[in-house]
């Protein structure tokens, strides 16, 4: 039998060759399958691609979510809907401009559906699901594509958006001016409850003559001119506001019987003011009530400001038709307090109280939280006015209050000088008389007859009159802004000796900032029967 020749090749090598061919075939099949899958993936509707989201996010979402965060989240349907809705709104305006009303109507309809879905999601506190978002996003995508296909290009969109933004800015500016005017009107108005209280107190004064004798005794008290006591002055026609100032001051004083309050009001409020302070206890402090009409020496022949207040042109400027640019841009120019002599009495303190040497001036919209008697021992270094400076903000520099384009101002004052605040000031009346500050005040009022140096208020002439005569105090003595600034640090308020509700949002008004109102209410005698009757009336 013939024998086959021996094959010296290894069997292992033949097996290796078979495996190589098997692996090559497997990779070829896998590549073909991957190609088919990728091809199918790219064939999908673009709107479906926009809707892809990780469903696991929905499964772990809490039942009540922060909808603001949901709208701003890059992975939420809410944000996608909001972005498409914004773009659709732009195309609504463009479609209307091109008289394509049908497309504008379709877009508006989808926008309303989108807004409804977003509001429902916000109300229920749960994210929008895929099934809810899909029909709206698909419809909006189709309409946006239709708008783009109508050749509403980017340039057209930008021009339309620009004009729309300008129109919105004009409306916003008009609304801001209107809000300022309305806020000013509310701030100027006397609340019904305060008017009611004034009437009741005036009636008491008229029907009870015994109070007149007590008032005369108070006015002749030797404590009123005793320089060993602590003297405070308040000029106001607001009974409740003045009461809170006095009550908060005596409540925080270590020795309230050593305090003397000098209150000046007008003829209208004089009787009510007397009746209130005679019928309430202020811990033994001395209180003097006077009327500004008593100061016969304060007349037009002596005081330029009195002459201006009586001037018909000045009254027309404040109360006439709003035809000037000043009254349009500055609605507070028309505030009647700028025509009230009470507002200007602070410049005549040494003449009103000729026997006093030092006094603390308090506005009627402040609340005292600490003992103020240490103010009287402060060293003012020969200055007249101790006040808290307000130049931490740039807009409280001199150039913001005064017209530095006028050489009379620019040649004498530093535009970057720090402003300061009225509201809580300690005055050295001896230094005042020596520097003749009131004469300075008269000079600047004369120079401002045409209102070319400043427009309104008592602070600008105060900055001029006390220039170089003001001693800066620690800011904790006087914290301002509670009548307009909602973001004052609580720690600053709590450590303040005096908090000041300067601004339109006074604490006795309904538009007061609620966060700050309790500080004022704490010192209001709300248990008084007249207050209870008038609040519920």
Swiss-Prot record:
<dbReference type="GO" id="GO:0005794">
    <property type="term" value="C:Golgi apparatus"/>
</dbReference>
<dbReference type="InterPro" id="IPR029993">
    <property type="entry name" value="GAUT"/>
</dbReference>
<keyword id="KW-0961">Cell wall biogenesis/degradation</keyword>
<keyword id="KW-1133">Transmembrane helix</keyword>
<keyword id="KW-0735">Signal-anchor</keyword>
<dbReference type="GO" id="GO:0010246">
    <property type="term" value="P:rhamnogalacturonan I biosynthetic process"/>
</dbReference>
<dbReference type="GO" id="GO:0047262">
    <property type="term" value="F:polygalacturonate 4-alpha-galacturonosyltransferase activity"/>
</dbReference>
<dbReference type="GO" id="GO:0016757">
    <property type="term" value="F:glycosyltransferase activity"/>
</dbReference>
<feature type="glycosylation site" description="N-linked (GlcNAc...) asparagine">
    <location>
        <position position="247"/>
    </location>
</feature>
<feature type="glycosylation site" description="N-linked (GlcNAc...) asparagine">
    <location>
        <position position="403"/>
    </location>
</feature>
<dbReference type="GO" id="GO:0000139">
    <property type="term" value="C:Golgi membrane"/>
</dbReference>
<feature type="glycosylation site" description="N-linked (GlcNAc...) asparagine">
    <location>
        <position position="299"/>
    </location>
</feature>
<dbReference type="GO" id="GO:0000137">
    <property type="term" value="C:Golgi cis cisterna"/>
</dbReference>
<dbReference type="GO" id="GO:0080001">
    <property type="term" value="P:mucilage extrusion from seed coat"/>
</dbReference>
<dbReference type="GO" id="GO:0048358">
    <property type="term" value="P:mucilage pectin biosynthetic process"/>
</dbReference>
<dbReference type="Pfam" id="PF01501">
    <property type="entry name" value="Glyco_transf_8"/>
</dbReference>
<keyword id="KW-0812">Transmembrane</keyword>
<comment type="similarity">
    <text>Belongs to the glycosyltransferase 8 family.</text>
</comment>
<dbReference type="GO" id="GO:0010442">
    <property type="term" value="P:guard cell morphogenesis"/>
</dbReference>
<feature type="glycosylation site" description="N-linked (GlcNAc...) asparagine">
    <location>
        <position position="66"/>
    </location>
</feature>
<keyword id="KW-0333">Golgi apparatus</keyword>
<keyword id="KW-0472">Membrane</keyword>
<feature type="glycosylation site" description="N-linked (GlcNAc...) asparagine">
    <location>
        <position position="525"/>
    </location>
</feature>
<keyword id="KW-0328">Glycosyltransferase</keyword>
<protein>
    <recommendedName>
        <fullName>Hexosyltransferase GAUT11</fullName>
        <ecNumber>2.4.1.43</ecNumber>
    </recommendedName>
</protein>
<dbReference type="InterPro" id="IPR002495">
    <property type="entry name" value="Glyco_trans_8"/>
</dbReference>
<dbReference type="InterPro" id="IPR029044">
    <property type="entry name" value="Nucleotide-diphossugar_trans"/>
</dbReference>
<feature type="transmembrane region" description="Helical; Signal-anchor for type II membrane protein">
    <location>
        <begin position="17"/>
        <end position="37"/>
    </location>
</feature>
<feature type="topological domain" description="Cytoplasmic">
    <location>
        <begin position="1"/>
        <end position="16"/>
    </location>
</feature>
<dbReference type="GO" id="GO:0052546">
    <property type="term" value="P:cell wall pectin metabolic process"/>
</dbReference>
<comment type="subunit">
    <text>Monomer.</text>
</comment>
<comment type="function">
    <text>Glycosyltransferase involved in pectin and/or xylans biosynthesis in cell walls. Required for the biosynthesis of pectin in seed coat epidermal (SCE) cells. Collaboratively with MUCI70, essential for the accumulation of seed mucilage, a gelatinous wall rich in unbranched rhamnogalacturonan I (RG I), and for shaping the surface morphology of seeds. Catalyzes homogalacturonan (HG) elongation by acting as an HG alpha-1,4 galacturonic acid transferase.</text>
</comment>
<keyword id="KW-0325">Glycoprotein</keyword>
<keyword id="KW-0808">Transferase</keyword>
<comment type="pathway">
    <text>Glycan metabolism; pectin biosynthesis.</text>
</comment>
<feature type="topological domain" description="Lumenal">
    <location>
        <begin position="38"/>
        <end position="537"/>
    </location>
</feature>
<dbReference type="GO" id="GO:0010192">
    <property type="term" value="P:mucilage biosynthetic process"/>
</dbReference>
<feature type="glycosylation site" description="N-linked (GlcNAc...) asparagine">
    <location>
        <position position="436"/>
    </location>
</feature>
